[in-house]
Amino acid sequence: MAKAVMMLPVLLSFLLLPFSSMALTQDFCVADLTCSDTPAGYPCKASVGAGDFAYHGLAAAGNTSNLIKAAVTPAFVGQFPGVNGLGISAARLDIAVGGVVPLHTHPAASELLFVTQGTVAAGFITSSSNTVYTRTLYAGDIMVFPQGLLHYQYNAGQSAAVALVAFSGPNPGLQITDYALFANNLPSAIVEKVTFLDDAQVKKLKSVLGGSG
C-alpha cells in the first residue's frame, strides 16, 4: 500500500505530460496554426524563421468608429505564433474621446496596461468583497488587472488615448459583461430576473447591443 501511494505522484506526472507546453522542454514552440489548438497550446512548426519572433501589427491604430469608440488590436497566438507556449501575449488599445472599454474579464490571463498617449481612467473589482480599485493613468503609467476580475478602461481626456497591453497568457480570452447579458438570445424575462432591470430597460439594451429574445 505504501509503495502504491509513493508511485501516485509519478503516475500523475505522466498523466499531465500531454498538457504541458512544448516550450517548457525546448527553447520555443512557434505555433503551427494549420493544426488545432490543444490544452498545451498549438503544436510546433517544423520550420521556423526570424519573422516568427517579430510582429508589426500593433503599429497602426485600431478603428474606433464603433459603439464603444474603442478598439483592441491583438497580438495573441493566433496573430503572433511566436508567443505559443511562452505564457505571454500583447495588444494595442485605442480609445477615442468619449470612448470606453466596458466592464469585462480575461478568464485566462492577468493584464498589464501601459499608457503611451492621452489619459485613461481604469479600475477593477475584487471577486469576494466587491472592493473597487480605480486610478487615472497618464502617458508612462502602468496598471495591473488580476486574472478573471471585472475591470474597465475609458478615455478621461480631451484627445485620443493609446495603451499597450501585456497578458500573462498566449490567448487571454475576453468576456464583456454588457454583451454577455444583452447581446444574446437569453429571454428578456430571465434577464430581468437576474439583473433587476425592468422589461423596457432590457429590451432597450438588447436592441442597442444586438440581442434577441
Curated annotation (Swiss-Prot):
UniProt main location, coarse: secreted
List of glycosylated residues? 63
Q: Which domain of life is it from?
A: Eukaryota
Q: What is this protein called?
A: Germin-like protein 8-14
| Disulfide bonding pattern of the chain | 29-44
Quaternary structure?
Answer: Oligomer (believed to be a pentamer but probably hexamer).
**Where found?**
Secreted, Extracellular space, Apoplast
Job description of the protein: May play a role in plant defense. Probably has no oxalate oxidase activity even if the active site is conserved.
InterPro entries xref list: Cupin_1, Germin, Germin_Mn-BS, RmlC-like_jellyroll, RmlC_Cupin_sf
Q: Where is the signal peptide?
A: 1-23
Q: What GO molecular function annotation could you give as one example from this UniProt entry?
A: manganese ion binding
Q: Which GO terms describe its cellular component?
A: apoplast; extracellular matrix
Q: Which gene encodes it?
A: GER5
Q: Where is the Cupin type-1 domain?
A: 56-203
Record field: transmembrane = none
Q: Which family does it belong to?
A: Belongs to the germin family.
- Annotated positions binding Mn(2+): 104, 106, 111, 151
Which modifications occur after translation, per UniProt? Phosphorylated on threonine residue.
What switches on expression, per the entry, is described as:
Down-regulated by drought stress.
Which SMART domains does the UniProt record give?
Cupin_1
User: Which keywords annotate this record?
Assistant: Apoplast, Disulfide bond, Glycoprotein, Manganese, Metal-binding, Phosphoprotein, Secreted, Signal
